[in-house]
Amino acid sequence: MNIKPEEITSIIRQQIENFNTNIETIDSGTIIQIGDGIARVYGLEDCMEGELIEFPNDVYGMALNLEQDNVGCVLLGSEEGIKEGNVVKRTKKVVEVPVGEALVGRVVNSLGMPIDGKGPVLTTETRDVEVPAPGVIDRQSVKEPLQTGIKAIDSMIPIGKGQRELIIGDRQTGKTAIAMDTILNQKGKDVICIYVAIGQKQSTVAHIVNDLTKMGAMDYTIVVSSTASDSAPLQYLAPYAGCSMGEYFMHKGKDVLIVYDDLSKHAVAYRTMSLLLRRPPGREAYPGDVFYLHSRLLERSARLSEKLGGGSLTALPIVETLAGDVTAYIPTNVISITDGQIFLESELFNAGQRPAVNAGISVSRVGGNAQIKAMKQVAGTLRLELAQYRELAAFSQFGSDLDKESVKRLEKGKRLVEILKQPQYGPMPVEKEIIILYAAVSNHLIDIPVNKIKEFEKELFNYIDTHYRDIGKDILEHKQLTDELKSKLDKAINDFKNVFLSEI
């Protein structure tokens, strides 16, 4: 057998030419401890804080503790089948969620995966979960109102687009109801709403989604749900994921409303993670950076400058108190971060005043600039008159004789309190709020019996819609009560009052 050296040479040359020199380097580590949804990994030398780590069984984790000899990761899925000695890999990416129009009308989890059984979310765009908040130059002041449709709030504690307004109160005082009514009131106003449920019962979230669907509000709403059965890391991520979804629309120049329900459970989830990661506990066993946990989330709400499109992200964080104690750690933290708070009281709620807003300690620090002039005109003295009424009501319980002026104030106060009551799922257009508040403040209701006020209000709107339809249009158009408009309103109210009183 003749072996020709030229043939061997050509074969070797061909092999060398076809040899692929692609070398793939994978930064990997080894699990040295796992349990309670926390994994400690040896290796991963150049790992970033918040980086996604790939575990076996298609489970991902997030690196949170970067220590000298190991990395502490929280698992974003089940730890079943993962054991010590398994190899994990770096992805060199941080946690991101899908964003875009395709999410509107859907119910998703903290990672943006659909959980409503309506198929995949058809979007290719993603956004990091943790994004720095816009700087001072990138913002403009809050000057446009975001109407909640709730008389007590729009008049005394107004909310502007780009504001952070805390809703705080004990359990079962109607906190979620206020947030829901605000979402319902955005119908037809080109506002995208995001409801983030953190640590809620699955049945509660299903009930909320059902109500939103029934009222036609899911057409402009995204629900991000991380229920009580989800792991602490998923509950921790939920508000940041919802915020990133909202920021996508904000940077497109749209107005967004986001509700975090609630941040007390969010802080508890973060405390759970921190204690399992062996971070030192502080006050109430929360870690030292629990203030930063919420401040970096809420600072992302803003009204962007015109140069950046003028979009806005308005936040309504909810915090639950225990026995009305607003001096606890999380409530004081969030009060100091937000631009005001709506305080709900169990006593008022149980006494039948719903929404149970305590106007005395509720405040909106920036919303006043956003209020339309007509509302300022009717609501200017409202808070003071209510405060005087409460003082007089407490004083009159001692049965002492009151002068005529005090009796008059008491009677007016009773009617104001009655006017501010409102049923759930009954948000009111701003022009109707102004009409009825004008009637109350201008002493038009003083001769209407208190138990007939609700009936009077309902029938007054029907009467105005039939006989004085242009009043509402004029209020929306001029955004202030001119002398001409006031006299027209006086005439309409008096005309109807005569009819109403004759029928009683």
UniProtKB/Swiss-Prot annotation:
Its main location: membrane. SUPFAM superfamilies: C-terminal domain of alpha and beta subunits of F1 ATP synthase, N-terminal domain of alpha and beta subunits of F1 ATP synthase, P-loop containing nucleoside triphosphate hydrolases. GO terms for molecular function: ADP binding; ATP binding; proton-transporting ATP synthase activity, rotational mechanism. It is an enzyme of class 7 (translocase). Gene3D superfamilies: 2.40.30.20, ATP synthase alpha/beta chain, C-terminal domain, P-loop containing nucleotide triphosphate hydrolases. It catalyses: ATP + H2O + 4 H(+)(in) = ADP + phosphate + 5 H(+)(out). One of its GO terms (cellular component) is plasma membrane. Its EC number is 7.1.2.2. This is ATP synthase subunit alpha. It comes from Clostridium botulinum (strain Loch Maree / Type A3).
